[in-house]
Curated annotation (Swiss-Prot):
Belongs to the SelA family. This is L-seryl-tRNA(Sec) selenium transferase. Its cofactor is pyridoxal 5'-phosphate. Pfam families: Se-cys_synth_N (PF12390), SelA (PF03841). InterPro entries: PyrdxlP-dep_Trfase, PyrdxlP-dep_Trfase_major, SelA-like, SelA_trans, SelA_trans_N_dom. It is an enzyme of class 2 (transferase). The gene is selA. GO terms for biological process: conversion of seryl-tRNAsec to selenocys-tRNAsec; selenocysteine incorporation. It comes from the Bacteria. Pathway: Aminoacyl-tRNA biosynthesis; selenocysteinyl-tRNA(Sec) biosynthesis; selenocysteinyl-tRNA(Sec) from L-seryl-tRNA(Sec) (bacterial route): step 1/1.
């Protein structure tokens, strides 16, 4: 008998009681698709190996495999996880957690019509950035603002609007690459402008910019090196110095600030990060930054600056392609409104709350976590509380660390650590941590909810 004839038909699988149950639970179409894929795999296996795929030895095995694949297919992939990596703004885990106010505003915008492009006072159409622009001007001192879907888009829009077919002067030490091999020179190429590099990797002087300026120069650009740091024999030009030079030639200065802090983090005992207000005070015409990093809101690219320049950005065709939807704008507005009460910011802005949690509070959480872990793990594992260092993440202050506390897990038995990591990731709400010095580190600095974590551990 041919091996191919041993493969069950889709109809035969569907007519079994188990097949009928699966069709009722997952839907007829989904079950048929999985059956078809599995049978095709069986044919390929026979063709290549000249034997039957093990799951086709018995129809009950086949149906069990179909159910497993249906469960895997139906599982939500962008699922909630516990961030115990010690990186608060973890790009791979979604960066900033939204505040309660931002979540509420976003949910309201999802379920209701909102005055997105409608002026309630005038009773007519308005611009969707209008309300947020007013807030940003109030917070930064700038004349106007423009909102797009991320900071790379903000840089692209600025370049395409003001520098297409022209030259942009930038220091070699600021030709950054962010995640995914995404580079400033690549953005410039897409915007249709010519990159003019000045200075060297570690030293750039004001005279380097001066010598590069010509009749085809569109503007001078500064990029905040937020995701790396050059130390030692270095020299760079400040925005204030660059603005003074640019004004001699009637040129603008534009700054990609990256993380985009709106408050001085040093007042909270955190590493100093340049603020948007500082750059505006230095005379920079356009400043771009992210919404989902130190700002603590949704992903967005924010541009603040002089009204005449912002108006041109708003009318560029790319702006419509890059604009944000009502949910993001609602979340961003609610986030920015928290900054109007700076004395309460560390309580209500989730990102700042996580960054400023006292070490004593983290130690209390660590004791709770250690206690639960000791009840769930075998004696093959050692569980200890250890001082740790966390980082902000998302390219913010790469050399700076923040004191933290971690629960560490170690074992002398081969393969046990890897097995536990797999168990952590297989939990209903996976635990994402780090491995360092042959130990699992569960760093509590970036954890949003200790009670939720403890409930998850109980399912280990």
């Amino acid at each position: 008998m041919s091996l191919y004839s041993s493969l069950p038909s889709i109809d035969k699988l569907l007519k079994t009681p188990e097949g009928a149950r699966l069709s009722h639970e997952f839907g007829h179409t989904a079950v048929v698709n999985i059956c078809r894929q599995l049978i095709e795999q069986g044919r390929e296996y026979i063709k290549n190996e000249n034997k039957l795929l093990p799951v086709f030895q018995d129809i009950s095995d086949t149906l069990r495999e179909i159910e497993l694949q249906l469960h895997a297919q139906s599982q939500v992939k962008i699922q909630s996880v516990h961030n115990l990596t010690g990186t608060i703004l973890h790009t791979n885990l979604g960066r900033a957690l939204w505040s309660d106010a931002a979540q509420h505003a976003a949910l309201t915008s999802m379920s209701h019509n909102v005055a997105l492009e409608y002026d309630l006072e005038e009773g007519k159409r308005s611009h969707r950035d209008h309300y947020i622009s007013d807030l940003l001007c109030q917070l930064t001192g700038a004349e106007a603002a423009c909102i797009v879907n991320n900071n790379a888009a903000a840089v692209l829009l600025m370049l395409a609007t003001f520098a297409q077919g022209k030259e942009v002067i930038i220091s070699r030490g600021e030709l950054i690459e962010i995640g995914g091999a995404f580079r400033i020179p690549d953005i410039m190429q897409q915007a249709g402008c010519k990159l003019v590099e000045v200075g060297t990797t570690n030293r750039t002087h004001l005279s380097d910019y001066r010598h590069a300026i010509n009749e085809n120069t569109a503007f001078l650009m500064k990029v905040h090196s937020s995701n790396y740091q050059i130390c030692g024999f270095t020299k760079s030009v400040t925005e204030a110095e660059l603005v003074t030079l640019a004004r001699e030639f009637n040129l603008p200065v534009m700054t990609d600030l990256g993380s985009g802090a709106l408050v001085d983090l040093a007042q909270y005992g955190l590493p100093k990060e340049p603020t948007v207000q500082e750059k505006w005070a230095q005379g920079v015409e356009l400043i771009s930054f992210s919404g989902d990093k130190l700002l603590g809101g949704p992903q967005a690219g924010i541009i603040v600056g002089k009204k005449a320049w912002i108006d041109r950005l708003q009318t560029h065709p790319l702006k419509r392609a890059l604009r944000c939807d009502k949910v993001i704008l609602a979340g961003l507005e609610a986030t920015l409104r928290l900054y109007l009460q700076p004395e309460k910011l560390s309580q209500h802005l989730t990102t700042l709350r996580l960054l400023t949690q006292p070490v004593e509070a983290l130690h209390e959480q660590a004791e709770q976590l250690q206690s639960v872990l000791l009840t769930k793990l075998t004696t093959d594992y050692s569980v200890a509380i250890t001082n740790s260092v966390a980082q902000i993440g998302s390219g913010s202050q790469p050399m700076a660390t923040i004191p933290s506390v971690a629960v560490t897990i170690s074992t002398e038995k081969a393969g046990k650590l890897t097995a536990l990591l797999q168990r952590f990731k297989a939990l209903p709400q996976p635990i994402i941590c780090r491995v360092e010095k042959e130990k699992i580190w569960l760093d509590l600095r970036g954890l949003a909810d200790i009670d939720s974590l403890l409930k998850t551990i109980m399912q280990l």
